Curated annotation (Swiss-Prot):
Heterotetramer of two alpha chains and two beta chains. GO terms for biological process: hydrogen peroxide catabolic process. The keyword Transport applies. GO terms for cellular component: blood microparticle; haptoglobin-hemoglobin complex; hemoglobin complex. The modification N-acetylvaline is found at residue 1. PANTHER family: HEMOGLOBIN FAMILY MEMBER (PTHR11442), HEMOGLOBIN SUBUNIT BETA (PTHR11442:SF42). The modification S-nitrosocysteine is found at residue 93. InterPro entries: Globin, Globin-like_sf, Globin/Proto, Hemoglobin_b, Hemoglobin_oxygen_transport. The keyword Phosphoprotein applies. The modification Phosphothreonine is found at residue 12. GO terms for molecular function: haptoglobin binding; heme binding; hemoglobin alpha binding; metal ion binding; organic acid binding; oxygen binding; oxygen carrier activity; peroxidase activity. This is Hemoglobin subunit beta. Red blood cells.
Length: 146
């Protein structure tokens, strides 16, 4: 992913304020509620029967944190996203059989959650920079599929 110096500064500056546990749990929870077919990958997480159950589910929150920690690794390795996410791409492709479109959906949900948490600070230029990173991460995660 190619970011200008300003974009890189905007992304790293805002990301330093992100509570990965809170934002990750909310982003994954929203993905599971808004796109319910994604729940099939999380059947072992227990009750996902309604929005309240999903958003309050401790396993969803914990996995959301794990997802955002991986995203953080990507932010530290923007010049090598493919390498950074190679093992996760292989896992999601070969073992979990996750549709790679779900990575893009999660990225879009993450944008909504960041906007909700950071309001005016998540202005259009910051969103544009995050969107680039998110798409780069989704593409890297989908790499094994090609």
């Amino acid at each position: 992913v190619h970011l200008t110096a300003d974009e890189k500064s905007a992304v790293t500056g805002l990301w330093g304020k992100v509570n990965v546990e809170e934002v990750g749990g909310e982003a994954l929870g929203r993905l599971l509620v808004v796109y319910p077919w994604t729940q099939r990958f999380f059947e072992s997480f227990g009750d996902l029967s309604n929005a309240g159950a999903v958003m309050g589910n401790a396993k969803v929150k914990a996995h959301g944190k794990k997802v955002l920690n991986a995203f953080s690794d990507g932010l530290k390795n923007l010049d090598n996203l493919k390498g950074t996410f190679a093992k996760l791409s292989e896992l999601h492709c070969d073992k979990l059989h996750v549709d790679p479109e779900n990575f893009r959906l999660l990225g879009n949900v993450l944008m909504i959650v960041l906007a909700r948490h950071f309001g005016k600070e998540f202005c259009p230029p910051v969103q544009a920079a995050f969107q680039k990173v998110s798409l780069g991460v989704a593409t890297a995660l989908g790499h094994k599929y090609h």
